[in-house]
UniProtKB/Swiss-Prot annotation:
Keyword list, A-Z: Cell cycle, Cell division, Chromosome partition, Cytoplasm, DNA integration, DNA recombination, DNA-binding
Pfam families, sorted: Phage_int_SAM_1, Phage_integrase
Job of this protein: Site-specific tyrosine recombinase, which acts by catalyzing the cutting and rejoining of the recombining DNA molecules. Essential to convert dimers of the bacterial chromosome into monomers to permit their segregation at cell division. Binds an atypical recombination dif site (difSL). Binds preferentially to the left arm and cooperatively to the right arm of difSL.
Gene Ontology cellular-component annotations: cytoplasm
Catalytic-site annotation from UniProt: R210, K234, H306, R309, H332, Y341
UniProt family annotation: Belongs to the 'phage' integrase family. XerS subfamily.
Organism: Lactococcus lactis subsp. cremoris (strain MG1363)
Protein name, UniProt field: Tyrosine recombinase XerS
InterPro entries given in the database record: CB (IPR044068), DNA_brk_join_enz (IPR011010), Integrase-like_cat_sf (IPR013762), Integrase_catalytic (IPR002104), Integrase_recombinase_N (IPR010998), Integrase_SAM-like_N (IPR004107), Recomb_XerS (IPR023670), Tyrosine_recombinase_XerCD (IPR050090)
Additional remarks: In contrast to the XerC-XerD complex present in non-streptococcaceae bacteria, XerS acts as a single recombinase required to recombine difSL recombination site.
Record-annotated Tyr recombinase domain positions: 169-354
PROSITE patterns: CB (PS51900), TYR_RECOMBINASE (PS51898)
Gene Ontology molecular function terms on file: DNA binding; tyrosine-based site-specific recombinase activity
Compartment(s) of residence: Cytoplasm
Gene that specifies this protein: xerS
Amino acid sequence: MKREQLIQNIEKLKHVMPPYVLEYYQSKLTIPYSLNTLYEYLKEYERFFSWLVDSGVADVDKITDVSLSVLENLTKRDLESFILYLRERPRLNTHSTRYGVSQTTINRTLSALSSLYKYLTEEVENEDGEPYFYRNVMKKVQTKKKSETLASRAENIKGKLFLGDETQGFLDYIDSEYEKTLSNRARSSFFKNKERDLAIIALILASGIRLSEAVNVDLRDLNLNTMIVEVTRKGGKRDAVPFAPFAKTYFERYLEVRSQRYKTTAKDTAFFVTLYRDIASRIDPSSVEKLVAKYSQAFKVRVTPHKLRHTLATRLYAQTNSQVLVSNQLGHASTQVTDLYTHIINEEQKNALDSL
């Protein structure tokens, strides 16, 4: 979704929210939470407050009028009823005959509500310097995480990684072979963004940064001499992330055409841009997801930008055997999340030994 459309959608949701949700939104902007995160949270709040009104838990006609006292006095049983509603309601925007939303969606909803309750009960200050209320019912609600062993996750993911020579092979395919699969018209469109697309994919494969971090890179953030890219991590923390040397050529090729092809000016600070009606703007995450899917499907298997991040992490661990180093590269606070990469590499090593 383009930034302009995202802002419009956020404004529509803000228009129907209670005042304290707007305060929450404004507070999180200062951290800063990304607009994408806040948009997803606002959608969850709209769903929750709509249920409060429709179920009669809140005795009001519209969600704007749901008072703080409703949230303060909400019982654990009320929240459990809401969770059951999510599990049992007909699924929307799908042809599936299944009912209810996924556990992942429910966890996301509860995470958004926990963030709001934490703000209202701990972070915000009224005129007396106290929170709006103290009772946090969200602390009584447990979430169920998706159960899957590391072996299962590794098995599911390793076929979607471009390990070893496949990393460069993927880039070479886009650079030299992909155009041969296209019609004349499609080839012309491909050439318009070829250098930019290669630079985006190379950046993620060479650094392992998140999609949201990649699209928000500015020109000043990328240093080709030190081979460092500065990004804003989750929680608003700035980080200097090294990238592998193979990406440098793709950045240089893109920079050679960026100004003329995308008609950028000094005001266009975004590194990765797109051109619409002769106006340059920052590329949006959905556009990157689509281009990664398009090229990867033609090359080997359809993947997401996050799988490119997994690719870098797995390759880096294979070279270093250091979970700490991989965690730092990915911007993780602990090494627990890197256990997956060790499992993938251990399986690869076992397969290599079996073939001796």
